[in-house]
Amino acid sequence: MTFTKKNVSVSQGPDPRTSIQTERANSKFDPVTMNYFLEGSKERSELMKSLAQQIERDPILFTDGSYYDLTKDQQRELTVLKINRLSRYREGDSVDTFNKRLSIMGVVDPQVATRIGVNLGLFLSCISGNGTAEQFKYWAIDKGTHNIQGLYGCFGMTELGHGSNVAGVETTATFDKETDEFVINTPHIGATKWWIGGAAHSATHCSVYARLVVDGKDYGVKTFVVPLRDSNHDLMPGVTVGDIGAKMGRDGIDNGWIQFSNVRIPRFFMLQKFCKVSAEGEVVLPPLEQLSYSALLGGRVMMVLDSYRMLARVSTIALRYAIGRRQFKGDNVDQNDPNALETQLIDYPLHQKRLFPYLAAAYVVSTGALKVEHTIQSTLATLDAAVENNDTTAIFKSIDDMKSLFIDSGSLKATTTWLAAEAIDQCRQACGGHGYSSYNGFAKAFNDWVVQCTWEGDNNVLSLSVGKPIIKQIIGIEDNGKTVRGSTAFLNQVKDFTGSNASKVVLNNTSDLNDINKVIKSIEVAIIRLAHEAAISVRKESLDFAGAELVQISKLKAHHYLLTEFVKRVGEFEHKELVPFLNTIGRLYSATVVLDKFAGVFLTFNVASPQAITDLASTQIPKLCAEVRPNVVAYTDSFQQSDMVINSAIGKYDGDVYENYFDLVKQLNPPKNTKAPYTAALEGMLNRPSLEARERYEKSDETAAILSK
């Protein structure tokens, strides 16, 4: 008889714990130092771990396996309790520190992060992006919103009949000169505000996107702050709200619908950084309307960071399980030897090819996420200063930067959230039947995650909006000799890779595949040639005829950005002993996530030779997987995500997958009362009398003999 951690066995059982301990002991680099790379610096790494520790030790914010058994109502209540608790941290945190705290909560309990983010992110960003400095000070600071106090905002853009086409929303804001008020109306069911996070129960105010109507003239969609509830939390007159009910995930968010019936607000509740309406009804339109949508960019950038953390989490779970799980004895082992161990899942080449790309993606996405986060902060700060000082030159410079940021943030949001969604399900499948258990984290992760592919820009629509300006830039260069600046400046080389140069191959052999800078160049050429071909159709028809190509261009642009920033960050990283391990990860990403997935594009447009693509599949990817394999545990440990953050029975640090999983199942489902509340129905089914007895034997031969006389 043997004794394991908590359970008694009559013979030696599986020992996954020893497997992961052995792997960890044989790792060739320090995960703590590697985390400095992933988080951008030692200081940020230590801050993130400190914030995670606070969450883990907080009795309200702490999350464990019981989280997966909560009902919708329980999730709603617990979410509010957590927001209440986080509001206390917000009072002592800087904005930057609290955003980092929310970034961790986005993995631990995403519905909490979202429900707060609607208020502090979307609502206040809308006011900051569209309101004057005085308006922002009033709504954010004076009213206490920035501290989650006083009032709670929601973001009223989406309608039942309009989502992606924001310019088409139909809620109206009609100016009444006599009272100096706007009258907010929902003219029909299609204009009902829909999917509004916080509207059902929480929000006191809403930043409403509505059509400005003055003297019967429609001036397009502007933004207005509209009170929904009074200080007693009762609905304001003319405001009707409802809960939209059960969703695929994130049930802790009180998404609702809103209808306005002649709701009057003061004229100065209209956000007036760009568009102004005087008391006499004079409308001063913004010279650059697109600036008013800057509020959406912050959310998109945060989703890139969310994608990194989700990729890190699910790849860690699947890889730790793959180390502990053994299945089938190898061909070189005596199948009849009872002492011969089965093969670890992690050692199957197919399993490596399935999972290692997502591990690599987490590393590469982390650098891009940090870069675009820094870029949006600096760009918006420069823009705000330019507008405040009425500096026309600086405004137009900021506009160029904003256009580039729109392309980068849009392509990154769409591509990385798609990638994370794919990773969650592939990692789940790689864990077999156990991956289907809610207690192992994938089910709720997927259901909570996939909305990221839809909100704040549906990924396909967003990808189209990224691809369109790139096509227009190509046409401008080719037809009008224009020069492009910013992150798409490489498009200026279009003549070098089209026309008589259309057959110029960038990736010829394995050596080229190993050179990340050449891979980056190949992505540029692929975008140029794809955009050049799409532009031919666009000139004849319209951009809509190039939809599939536009989405491909957007994805390639995202990978170009991510790999470029990864290479820069590796070159700047002070811990040179880690560079070889990072280079391996970067090459694996470029080989699997980029070249393998887009092999058709690279072959079709002569960017890579057929031999290079053949070598990629037969030699390069298996070789890179073999290089990553000895340090898989160190690579995952480098994410520095605790067991509380991971929240998966099979993904814990100690690797004891069976003990941990079995213990959690017994803890949350005590095997004491084995009869269910519906046992009577089961017993009635199993113990029911025979059909003849239930028919009182009225159709029996005996009855027939009696009745036939």
Curated annotation (Swiss-Prot):
GO terms for cellular component: peroxisome. It catalyses: a 2,3-saturated acyl-CoA + O2 = a (2E)-enoyl-CoA + H2O2. Residues 1-24 have a biased composition (Polar residues). Keywords: FAD, Fatty acid metabolism, Flavoprotein, Lipid metabolism, Oxidoreductase, Peroxisome. It comes from the Eukaryota. Pfam families: ACOX, ACOX_C_alpha1, Acyl-CoA_dh_M, Acyl-CoA_ox_N. The keyword Signal does not apply. Its cofactor is FAD. Pathway: Lipid metabolism; peroxisomal fatty acid beta-oxidation. Its EC number is 1.3.3.6. The keyword Transcription does not apply. It is found in: Peroxisome. GO terms for molecular function: acyl-CoA oxidase activity; FAD binding; fatty acid binding. Belongs to the acyl-CoA oxidase family. This is Acyl-coenzyme A oxidase 4. It comes from Candida maltosa.
